[in-house]
A protein has these predicted regions:
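Sec-dependent N-terminal signal peptides
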Residues: 4-13
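Short, flexible, glycine/charge-rich loop motifs used to bind or transfer phosphoryl groups or to couple energy/partner
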Residues: 15, 42-43, 88, 116
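N-terminal activation segment of mature serine protease catalytic domains
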Residues: 16-54, 59-63, 72, 121-129
């Protein structure tokens, strides 16, 4: 029984070490919402957070609703307190996807881009992170 428990524990840690955690980032966006019916009023400021994944060409894939209409966007790596300014390069609200670019290329040090595949089959195993 102890051997089985040890094997299960080791396999869980082995699985966790294969997860691409250094590809997942946290996204912070600031949106100001102007009231056009009462333009003399100050706009309401909203702070939104979400997650994204580093993809090829030093870009970040995220949900469009996280950055749609944002005046300011920052990204942060896992286990790093520093935030980096980012810009929305492409956005499609129809499919709820956006691609960000980070202005400081040092952000991508010690990260690995996720590989996107088109070869997905029914019943393939999938892990969601972020």
């Amino acid at each position: 029984m102890k051997k089985i428990l040890l094997i299960l524990t080791l396999s869980i840690f082995s699985f966790a070490s294969n997860l691409p955690i250094n590809s997942v980032v946290k996204i912070f966006s600031t949106v100001s919402d102007q009231n056009y019916l009462e333009p003399w009023e100050n706009p309401k400021i909203y702070n939104l957070t979400g997650s994204g994944a580093i993809i090829k060409d030093n870009r970040i894939l995220t949900s469009a609703h996280v950055v749609s209409g944002a005046n300011f966007v920052e990204v942060q790596k896992e286990n790093d307190s520093k935030k980096y300014e980012a810009t929305v390069k492409y956005i499609s609200n129809d499919v709820d996807l956006a691609i960000l670019e980070v202005n400081d290329k040092s952000f991508f040090a010690n990260t690995k881009a996720l590989e996107i595949t088109e070869d997905v089959k029914i019943k393939d195993s999938v892990t969601a992170i972020g």
